[in-house]
UniProtKB/Swiss-Prot annotation:
Keyword tRNA processing part of the UniProt annotation: yes
Binding site for (6S)-5-formyl-5,6,7,8-tetrahydrofolate: 29, 91, 132, 460
Record text on cofactor binding: Binds 1 potassium ion per subunit.
This enzyme's EC code(s): 3.6.-.-
Protein name: tRNA modification GTPase MnmE
Entry-linked InterPro entries: G_TrmE, GTP-bd, GTP-bd_TrmE_N, GTPase_MnmE, MnmE_dom2, MnmE_helical, P-loop_NTPase, Small_GTP-bd
A Pfam family recorded for this sequence: MMR_HSR1
Keywords: Cytoplasm, GTP-binding, Hydrolase, Magnesium, Metal-binding, Nucleotide-binding, Potassium, tRNA processing
Subcellular localization: Cytoplasm
Superkingdom of the organism of origin: Bacteria
A molecular function GO annotation: GTP binding
A single Gene Ontology CC term: cytosol
Names of required cofactors: K(+)
């Protein structure tokens, strides 16, 4: 977008984090055509740099015309188009107490009827509409703000730098090249030799492989950003609560020798190897006539469905028996699962059936023997062993549009296979390109844009 989009109103909001109510500095951001004039009305300054673009100067916030000052501030002016939003932007750097920053904001809003509180994400939305950033960069800004670990923050910054757009544009350019040739053949059929379907299918296969790789990595991206939810499942008294306490490094669940001690779900959020994990301790599964315990067991099966990963724990003392097999059969086949044999300190591992050892981690939770192997197994099965090779974060919206594009390309294969009219290839390729354009924000409705930016914080 070359032109700068402006609106009649000017927006303002607290742009810094002040959730605890205290801080050294708080920033009020103002954007719009009245940003500078509105701030001039409430700021007294003698600085020779006052109101110059990209200059910081000192001033005082004036509450009324009687020169009553309420705060000493630093003011940063960024004039259109050289600002984040593309509009005139002023930042007021106040002292960080919640009382004073709210007071300054209130004075600012009362200075001009065309200044209002910004909607969530409205600064970023204006930056997008003015062509300062694409939609993936805007979403990456929000991801960076909400990052829960360093790797998630790194992926978010990669998106801010435009890495997502680069990958999408690369795929889109491949499809545009194919589309240009096909449309030229449709319009000037007599000027071309026969169409090389084999070459076309080969080129499209390469494009599909790029898309499939992005979609495949998207789940791993989600684990890095949102975390892995891990349900501890098994019969009573096999060590589920002990494992929760071991991973949490503190006692979160009551541990006794009495079967059925855990009757409700206990959840603990941890960060292990810089990956957020939610460990869910569930009630032991067994036949029972006790009503409260039965409710807990029902919740256990509910958590199996909700979780990304299942650790099924059984006692090596008792062995892996028919009851264990029956419970595992209830776990959906698509679920990632690791079987953990606990209490290895109480038995001679040489006497364990070799079939039982297959795909099983042997552990002594009591003696903390096997924790590293368990963590490594979780990370490997979730595809995070080579986490450094994942350099972008694709959210659910991106994945949906990539899948739609992949569906379009699969349809072109069917068109060729069934010898359907040649111009249908053009239609599917155009739809595929359009689905890719939606990712970067070139093909979106105003309603959908509003929905995306509404999930941002107000000051961004």
């Amino acid at each position: 977008m070359d032109s700068i989009v402006t609106t009649e109103d000017t927006i303002a909001a607290i742009a810094s984090a002040i959730s605890i109510g205290k801080g050294g500095v708080a920033i009020i951001r103002v954007s719009g055509k009245d940003a500078i004039n509105s701030c001039k009305k409430i700021v007294q300054t003698k600085s020779k740099y006052a109101w110059e673009s990209h200059r910081v100067f000192r001033g005082f916030i004036q509450e009324n015309k009687q020169n009553k000052f309420i705060d000493e501030v630093l003011i940063l002016v960024m004039k259109s188009p050289n600002s984040f939003t593309g509009e005139d932007v002023v930042e007021l750097h106040c002292h960080g107490g919640i009382i004073i920053v709210n007071k300054v904001l209130k004075i600012l809003l009362s200075s001009n009827s065309r200044v209002r509180i910004a909607n969530p994400g409205e600064f970023s939305q204006r930056a997008f509409l003015n062509g300062k950033i694409d939609l993936t960069q805007a979403e990456s800004i929000n991801q960076l703000i909400n990052a829960s670990n360093t790797r998630s923050a790194e992926l978010a910054f990669s998106g801010i730098q435009g890495e997502i757009k680069k990958k999408i544009d690369d795929i889109k350019n491949d499809l545009i090249n194919q589309l240009c040739e096909i449309e030229a053949r449709v319009d000037f059929e007599e000027d071309f030799t026969d169409f090389d379907y084999t070459k076309y299918l080969k080129n499209i296969k390469k494009v599909k492989e790029k898309i499939e790789l992005l979609i495949e990595n998207a789940k791993r991206n989600s684990y890095i950003h949102n975390g892995i939810s891990i349900a501890l499942i098994g019969k009573t008294n096999v060590g589920k609560s002990s494992l929760l306490n071991l991973l949490a490094k503190k006692e979160k669940a009551i541990v006794t020798n009495i079967p059925g001690t855990t009757r409700d779900v206990i959840e603990v959020n941890l960060t292990i190897n810089d990956i957020p994990m939610k460990i869910i301790d569930t009630a032991g599964i067994r036949e029972t006539y006790e009503q409260i315990e039965s409710i807990g067991i029902k919740k256990s099966f509910g958590k199996i469905k909700e979780s990304d990963f299942i650790i099924y724990i059984y006692s090596l003392e008792e062995g892996f028996n028919e009851e264990d097999k029956k419970i595992i059969q209830e776990i959906p086949k698509e679920k990632l699962i690791t079987i953990l044999g606990n209490k290895k300190d109480l038995i001679d591992c040489k006497n364990i059936n070799s079939n039982e050892l297959k795909n099983t981690i042997l552990m002594s939770i009591k003696n903390n023997d096997g924790e590293k192997l368990l963590i490594d197994t979780i990370i490997k099965k979730c595809g995070l062993k080579q986490v450094e090779n994942i350099n972008i974060f694709l959210n659910e919206r991106h994945q949906t549009n990539l899948s739609a594009c992949l569906s379009n390309l699969n349809d072109t294969d069917e068109i060729i296979e069934n010898k359907l009219p040649f111009d249908l290839l053009s239609i599917e390729l155009r739809d595929g390109i359009q689905n890719l354009s939606k990712i970067t924000g070139q093909e979106l409705t105003e309603e959908l844009l509003d929905n995306i930016f509404s999930k941002f914080c107000i000051g961004k």
